[in-house]
Amino acid sequence: MMYPIPGVLSPQDVARFREQLEQAEWVDGRVTTGAQGAQVKNNQQVDTRSTLYAALQNEVLNAVNQHALFFAAALPRTLSTPLFNRYQNNETYGFHVDGAVRSHPQNGWMRTDLSATLFLSDPQSYDGGELVVNDTFGQHRVKLPAGDLVLYPSSSLHCVTPVTRGVRVASFMWIQSMIRDDKKRAMLFELDNNIQSLKSRYGENEEILSLLNLYHNLLREWSEI
């Protein structure tokens, strides 16, 4: 399943990010991918050795950690260090699959259950640049407003189509979820959404408390901590 997460960054935050990224040092995006991905990857990424990168990636982590919908959908256990990429002048990233595990500065290694793209460019400012994801439900093409994020299973084949006008800038990361199984995670997300909807409509009652108890018991049964 794919989950759009709106408003991870405010318009003011996006504008500030874009202004700072104009001053960033950009390097060949192939430096952070494996042999298979390098064959189809043609973009640029912010140099992770720069002081600016360290500040911006911390801000992205803070933003997603404070976003309730992101937490409900991902149930994150470990977040990778966010990276930043840029596409322009027909740059693209062909179909590829993300690595199953990644190194992590604190945890050593993490499993990649979910991938996330945080859009930092207004969709009207560039042509092309859609994130295309193939999963069991078909093919999805995603081009969200700046400040919005999309979550999708890391096991999915995906690509970024060529940017034929303008510049597409985004941040991206991987998540190891407390719930390894996509279907179980999707069920918990749907249950959580329905509980929140019922609470807003009817307030607290015994039936909602029973559903909340069910949610937490399922989370307790399925989670890997």
UniProtKB/Swiss-Prot annotation:
Q: Which residues bind Fe cation?
A: H96, D98, H158
What keyword terms does UniProt attach to this protein? Dioxygenase, Iron, Metal-binding, Oxidoreductase, Vitamin C
**What detail does the entry give on cofactor binding?**
Binds 1 Fe(2+) ion per subunit.
Q: Which cofactor does it need?
A: Fe(2+); L-ascorbate
- Under which main EC class is this enzyme filed? oxidoreductase
Biological process according to GO? DNA damage response; intracellular iron ion homeostasis
Q: What is its EC number?
A: 1.14.11.-
Instruction: Please indicate if the UniProt record lists Iron as a keyword.
Output: yes
GO MF entries: 2-oxoglutarate-dependent dioxygenase activity; iron ion binding; L-ascorbic acid binding
Positions that bind 2-oxoglutarate: R168
Its protein name is PKHD-type hydroxylase YbiX
